[in-house]
Amino acid sequence: MSKQPSLSYKDAGVDIDAGEALVERIKGVAKRTARPEVMGGLGGFGALCEIPAGYKQPVLVSGTDGVGTKLRLALNLNKHDSIGQDLVAMCVNDLVVCGAEPLFFLDYYATGKLNVDVAATVVTGIGAGCELAGCSLVGGETAEMPGMYEGEDYDLAGFCVGVVEKAEIIDGSKVATGDALIALPSSGPHSNGYSLIRKILEVSATDIENTQLDGKPLTDLLMAPTRIYVKPLLQLIKNTGAVKAMAHITGGGLLDNIPRVLPKNAQAVVDVASWQRPAVFDFLQEKGNVDEHEMHRVLNCGVGMVICVAQDQVEAALNELRAAGEQPWVIGHIAEAAEGAAQVELQNLKAH
């Protein structure tokens, strides 16, 4: 008989009991997000969801995303309560731009060693994001992978499926010269540009935990959860029918994201002087000596969503958005793109 000790999964660094404890902790979170179309609870091999009633030609829309290196900042600060909302926002905001209503969401949480408290905090944030978006958290995967991640470090990915009526898909094809562009404010950098942000903080030797801007801790400004625009935008679409295109301003800023929803011959003319850039962006620009054009190519600079409507629909759209609790403003207009011209022209860029 071998004298070698009997090895278990736990000896290899995987704690099945911890995984089961996490599932029990998060069942209530998932239940709070339940939509009537979702069939069954957590724990099955697959999650089932009916198409909501009332759709004539339903088209499913899917998306997946992560939160980039904002996660590294969350880990360094031991702040895990809002990163889940970031994850949901990055997915559902991408879905809503084509007019889709998010139906359900799944998450993937991978870690070297599962900390049940941290994971439960993250998933609670995911649940809060799902509630804000009106979609169900129907399942996910928690992978404890010793040797793949350092200690209790973790990575996140999100997956979302939504539905839109085929005849009501918003694809930018109706955008025309003279149309107006309306902006919705971001809460901060959202979930993009954090590799640059972290480099700026490192090179400038900023004491992030003891720095305040306008009386607010820099950590709070940088970790502010990504805004979820789903409900105000779906209300705008339903009540006005005015929306021709929408762009979620993520990595690539205004310069790279607006062209994704424009016809080839259209140019977005954006007046950078039309809004007061939040102080956190000016702080980052100054500390990193970042070129103004680079700021708009990497960061959202205070704009989280851009909406295109006809000029005669501007007031109705602004009023509808304000009624939904938003603070919209007209950020620019659509012009005809000259041959070879960029699809976004930024006017009134400040000299730096």
Swiss-Prot record:
Pathway: Purine metabolism; IMP biosynthesis via de novo pathway; 5-amino-1-(5-phospho-D-ribosyl)imidazole from N(2)-formyl-N(1)-(5-phospho-D-ribosyl)glycinamide: step 2/2. It catalyses: 2-formamido-N(1)-(5-O-phospho-beta-D-ribosyl)acetamidine + ATP = 5-amino-1-(5-phospho-beta-D-ribosyl)imidazole + ADP + phosphate + H(+). It comes from the Bacteria. Keywords: ATP-binding, Cytoplasm, Ligase, Nucleotide-binding, Purine biosynthesis. GO terms for molecular function: ATP binding; phosphoribosylamine-glycine ligase activity; phosphoribosylformylglycinamidine cyclo-ligase activity. It is found in: Cytoplasm. GO terms for cellular component: cytosol. The keyword Iron-sulfur does not apply. GO terms for biological process: 'de novo' IMP biosynthetic process; adenine biosynthetic process. Pfam families: AIRS, AIRS_C. Its main location: cytoplasm. InterPro entries: PurM-like_C_dom (IPR010918), PurM-like_C_sf (IPR036676), PurM-like_N (IPR016188), PurM-like_N_sf (IPR036921), PurM_cligase (IPR004733). Its EC number is 6.3.3.1. The keyword GTP-binding does not apply. Belongs to the AIR synthase family. NCBIfam families: purM. This is Phosphoribosylformylglycinamidine cyclo-ligase. It comes from Pseudomonas putida (strain ATCC 47054 / DSM 6125 / CFBP 8728 / NCIMB 11950 / KT2440). The gene is purM.
